[in-house]
Amino acid sequence: MSSTPEQAKNKGLTFRKFKDGDNKVHWNEWIFDADHSHKCPEYMLSSPPCQASCPAGEDIRGYLNIVRGIEKPPVGMTWQEYAFRRISEANPFPSVMGRVCPAPCESGCNRNQVEDHVGINSVEHFVGDWAIQNNMKYTSTAQPTGKKVAIIGGGPAGLAAAYQLALKGHACTIFDEHELLGGMMRYGIPGFRTPREVLDGEIQRILDLGVQTRMKTRVGSDVSFDELEKNYDAIFMSMGAQSGRPLPVSGAEAPNCVTAMAFLRAFNDGRLKHVGKKVVVIGGGDTSIDVATVARRLGNITNINPDKARPEHVIAGQVAHDVADISARQGAEVVLVSRATMDKMNANKHEIEHALQEGIEIIGGVTPVAVVLGPDGRATALRVAEFEVVKGETVLKPGTERELPADLVVSAIGQAVDFTGLEPFDNNKGLIKPDSNYRFPGKPHIFVGGDVIRPHLLTTAIGHASIAADGIDAFLRGHTELDKRPKVDAHRFDMLRKLVESGHPLEEYNHKQSWGTSSAKYAVHNFEDRSSKYVIPANELFLGHFPYVDRNVREMTSLNAEQALGNFEERLQLLSEKQVVDEAKRCMSCGLCFECDNCVVYCPQTAVFRVKKSDVTTGRYVDTDYTKCIGCHICADVCPTGYIQMGMGE
């Protein structure tokens, strides 16, 4: 008999393989190999990785199960509305986020271990658009508390906080320096990615809850922070980071060297109608792609007075372009420069691909060295070079410097918070550092959220607002100490709420001593909710249950360089209702029963059985007769979702 190299290393083995007294298998492994054990199945609710990966904390598994028809809506409600209600418990902007969120939930999706992630973003997009088309409204059943909350900033964090607090019965007033609400959703993202009618519709739903606004009002100058503290019971600070960071190189003070935030604001305000012949953008994230694609669409106008209509004058707010001039628009050469190589850029991959299709040149792996100035002090080129990082320092590679001609240079290398009038809150790094409940240390009535904590995703700002709103609500109700947030801080399936909703509320506990019971109606038997602290990995699922199914992918209108010029139409196309339902069916419902019947079919003792149809609800589809169960763990082995765990008896 031949031996493997690994076996040859085991010198303790003889031809008998085991010494006298050795056990072939350790006793604590018997449960996994024997045909019976002391353990019996229990039904354990875990969080799926998509929810744990969602900064907004959406109950993603929940609304996918609604769309696919597993979790039934209340009588008289469509599945579309029920899915919308479930999404908006965490996120009041499903239509916007379904379009622009980079979907970290999809990166975490366990379905990636089968073939491809579930198109979570596309389902949210469909549900959000359906809600707008069908005029869905938010309603609050909470009694007014008489408490007032001031919200500084009307961007995603401020609006989401106002929404959550209004649902809890508190009166909210948003203070914003702009003419319109929306923050980065309006002024930082172009309209061909977030159509303004969609954004306006989702904002109006929040205002319809009774939220008040003070527009064109800057806290710190138009109204003092002291006034807010005097007139309001709590304050939520969500000013955003809408000031761009200039290039840290010589020549960056040139008037035609501008920040991405200023560029996008001028475009979204409707003031900027065209750019120069040659535009160079420095960045690598989604904002830099937005700037580049906007510049490609705006194009260049040659026969125009340059002193009157230079882009930098418009961006600085000195003048606005005349809409009559755009008929003479010609294509602009747009180059995007990134320190990261193209495969490692932070921008969404499909956005990079579309930028290339539209004729935008992307140069990765180079760093800005200097802005080259002409005799008039304006930028004429950006000097770049290849580099390497040595001990944290950028070292230029000799002989790799080159100049990229430019009559407009746009820096998209980061954002900053303007603390004018609010300087005491600056942590000397241009940000605010709150505690884990997003409360400002030493100020129990002040909470913080959004890019003032750390410039990040829109969905992150929405998640901050949800957590902060819980803290504000607790504070306003007299709780000075706030509860510790759960490890998995997301909106989750609530078994008790579902039992009430489906007409099966638990009975009152009679407080009488008795032996263990599986028939009393005052408890949910053999069920454990670990969703606040446990995320179920793919290796705890029965992946063999799931056949290969192609993802339903949204179509994206592809434009070449000529077609992109002057084209401000939305590119992302909605899935059909059938496609959305089919896509939701690809969800593996990680950590929660999706009623496949595997456990019932394969149980050799017929111990696992379906609950009576009149008593069925989500998560209570099957039960176990423990007088028959021998602990063979077959039901757990064949459970596709990992909902059945061999725990009872430990």
Predicted regions and their residues:
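Extended, hydrophobic alpha-helical segments in both membrane/secreted and soluble proteins
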Residues: 156-161, 172, 243, 281, ...
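Conserved beta-strand-loop-beta-strand element in the redox core of flavoprotein oxidoreductases
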Residues: 215-235, 373-402, 619
